[in-house]
Amino acid sequence: MNDMVCAGRVTSTHGVRGCVRFRSYMSVDFKFPGIDVSIGGVSYTVCGAFSRGFPMFVLTLSRVGSACEAEKLVGFDVFLSESLLPPLQVGEYYCKDLVGLAVYDLEECVGHVSMLYDFGAAAEVLEIVLLSGKKVMIPFTSAFVADIDLNKKRLAVVFPPEI
């Protein structure tokens, strides 16, 4: 499985038959059953999934038949093949494509994107490491992100006055 992307994280066990609770980083309508995933470097097939209220799901995995086996997976990220990702609409981006982009304020490079956070609020938050080494966070909204050019590997931002 090359070109793996993180789809979420196992947060706890569910029941006594080896199911796991999973916090998804995917879109609401992503279909998990039948896909192969990697957890802790081991491959599993998702045999079943049901929602516990997005973004939480309960997954049934191949070769995990008890709560003890499921417990060993808690805390691990769940990876899947990038080829399984759904196509994006105009103006949508995958987090993996934004991390590492150079950040520009007008025409001057001022740093790079180090992380994209989703704290469950109305908007995701970009963490930017400035050339000085200082880390700043701005909302990932059109009010602060003026342009994204993946071909040029750059993101133009409008910093609030206090930054």
Curated annotation (Swiss-Prot):
<dbReference type="GO" id="GO:0006364">
    <property type="term" value="P:rRNA processing"/>
</dbReference>
<dbReference type="InterPro" id="IPR009000">
    <property type="entry name" value="Transl_B-barrel_sf"/>
</dbReference>
<dbReference type="InterPro" id="IPR056792">
    <property type="entry name" value="PRC_RimM"/>
</dbReference>
<keyword id="KW-0143">Chaperone</keyword>
<dbReference type="GO" id="GO:0043022">
    <property type="term" value="F:ribosome binding"/>
</dbReference>
<dbReference type="InterPro" id="IPR002676">
    <property type="entry name" value="RimM_N"/>
</dbReference>
<keyword id="KW-0690">Ribosome biogenesis</keyword>
<dbReference type="InterPro" id="IPR011961">
    <property type="entry name" value="RimM"/>
</dbReference>
<dbReference type="Pfam" id="PF24986">
    <property type="entry name" value="PRC_RimM"/>
</dbReference>
<comment type="subunit">
    <text>Binds ribosomal protein uS19.</text>
</comment>
<comment type="similarity">
    <text>Belongs to the RimM family.</text>
</comment>
<dbReference type="Pfam" id="PF01782">
    <property type="entry name" value="RimM"/>
</dbReference>
<dbReference type="GO" id="GO:0042274">
    <property type="term" value="P:ribosomal small subunit biogenesis"/>
</dbReference>
<keyword id="KW-0698">rRNA processing</keyword>
<protein>
    <recommendedName>
        <fullName>Ribosome maturation factor RimM</fullName>
    </recommendedName>
</protein>
<dbReference type="GO" id="GO:0005840">
    <property type="term" value="C:ribosome"/>
</dbReference>
<dbReference type="GO" id="GO:0005737">
    <property type="term" value="C:cytoplasm"/>
</dbReference>
<keyword id="KW-0963">Cytoplasm</keyword>
<feature type="domain" description="PRC barrel">
    <location>
        <begin position="90"/>
        <end position="155"/>
    </location>
</feature>
<dbReference type="InterPro" id="IPR036976">
    <property type="entry name" value="RimM_N_sf"/>
</dbReference>
<comment type="function">
    <text>An accessory protein needed during the final step in the assembly of 30S ribosomal subunit, possibly for assembly of the head region. Essential for efficient processing of 16S rRNA. May be needed both before and after RbfA during the maturation of 16S rRNA. It has affinity for free ribosomal 30S subunits but not for 70S ribosomes.</text>
</comment>
<dbReference type="InterPro" id="IPR011033">
    <property type="entry name" value="PRC_barrel-like_sf"/>
</dbReference>
